[in-house]
């Protein structure tokens, strides 16, 4: 129903900002029964992002792999195919399975980049250490600068939105690389 679709629209920014207190109960429980069938893939994605936000990376990886196995179609793809692989990569990175992280990133790049989709890599630039940057340099050098440019352009805007949305403060003094290093130290 429309109330649940409104919750979907409100839940996504909460998950993106790591504001887990605003995530709907039905997303936390993975209960998509009130969503229209067309909206269930988005509900599933939000539930997976919820696992990421809770740092439940082993569960996230298993759930994403299952979703890929059930969702994937041989002759076509959707944006969800790319984002599921990006979530797998993030989970693997956090589980110190860097080679597997790279495999998932390369699968996502193989689908996305020939079609001009850079946003998934911009959005995940910070969640996989320097892996995206290294893989772009090695395998897709023509895409490295465009992805980095868009990433840099959105970084400060993301911080401003985050600070207003969560009423918390992330400094704008650090570069993305410095911020990644600070995250690793913490």
Question: Where do the model's predicted regions map?
Answer:
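Residue register of alpha-helical TPR repeats
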Residues: 5-8, 42-45, 49, 81-83, ...
